[in-house]
């Protein structure tokens, strides 16, 4: 018989840097999950991801206080800021441009995000990511 899911917890945790401090500790502690066990498993699973990159994770907590988790790809906005070399997007994206991204960089981000995005094809994903870039005040070249 399958275990009963008690809760789903959605967090963004820096890859390879999960520790019991907030936001991880309190979110897991209130459901009675072994926090250090999660931190060790998460850090091991995100070894291949660039250290410190915010990584979304969905944790399923079961009635016996065990858990499983799924890591997702970093948010498109984070990948775009990294590609453009800027710290943050523009406060006024239509008038103040803060950086540029090329079509090849958008292609690379779309391929990275392909597993998580529900776009029909890679071109649709590229258009979606280009729209995100424009809404952040980035100029899309190409």
From Swiss-Prot:
The record's SMART domains line, in alphabetical order, gives: RL11
Question: Region Disordered: start and end of each range?
Answer: 84-103
Alphabetical UniProt keywords = Methylation, Ribonucleoprotein, Ribosomal protein, RNA-binding, rRNA-binding
What Gene Ontology biological process does one annotation of this record name? translation
- InterPro entries for the chain: Ribosomal_uL11, Ribosomal_uL11_bac-typ, Ribosomal_uL11_C, Ribosomal_uL11_C_sf, Ribosomal_uL11_CS, Ribosomal_uL11_N, Ribosomal_uL11_N_sf
- Give the matching Pfam families: Ribosomal_L11 (PF00298), Ribosomal_L11_N (PF03946)
Provide the Gene Ontology terms for cellular component.
cytosolic large ribosomal subunit
In what way is this protein post-translationally modified? One or more lysine residues are methylated.
- A Gene Ontology MF term for this entry? large ribosomal subunit rRNA binding
Q: Which family does it belong to?
A: Belongs to the universal ribosomal protein uL11 family.
The entry describes its oligomerization and partners as: Part of the ribosomal stalk of the 50S ribosomal subunit. Interacts with L10 and the large rRNA to form the base of the stalk. L10 forms an elongated spine to which L12 dimers bind in a sequential fashion forming a multimeric L10(L12)X complex.
Q: What does this protein do?
A: Forms part of the ribosomal stalk which helps the ribosome interact with GTP-bound translation factors.
Q: Which NCBIfam families match?
A: L11_bact (TIGR01632)
Q: What is this protein called?
A: Large ribosomal subunit protein uL11
Lineage of the native species? Bacteria, Pseudomonadati, Pseudomonadota, Gammaproteobacteria, Vibrionales
**Gene from which this protein is expressed:** rplK
């Amino acid at each position: 018989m399958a275990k009963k899911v008690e809760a789903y917890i959605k967090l963004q945790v820096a890859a390879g840097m999960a520790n019991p401090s907030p936001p991880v500790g309190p979110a897991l502690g209130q459901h009675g999950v072994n926090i250090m066990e999660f931190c060790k498993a998460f850090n091991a699973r995100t070894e291949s991801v660039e250290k410190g990159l915010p990584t979304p994770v969905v944790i399923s907590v079961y009635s016996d206080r065990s858990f499983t988790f799924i890591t997702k790809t970093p948010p498109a906005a984070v990948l775009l800021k990294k590609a453009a070399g800027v710290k943050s997007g523009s406060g006024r994206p239509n008038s103040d441009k803060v950086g540029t991204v090329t079509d090849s960089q958008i292609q690379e981000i779309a391929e990275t995000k392909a597993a998580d995005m529900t776009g029909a094809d890679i071109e649709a994903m590229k258009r979606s990511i280009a729209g995100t870039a424009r809404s952040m005040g980035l100029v899309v070249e190409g």
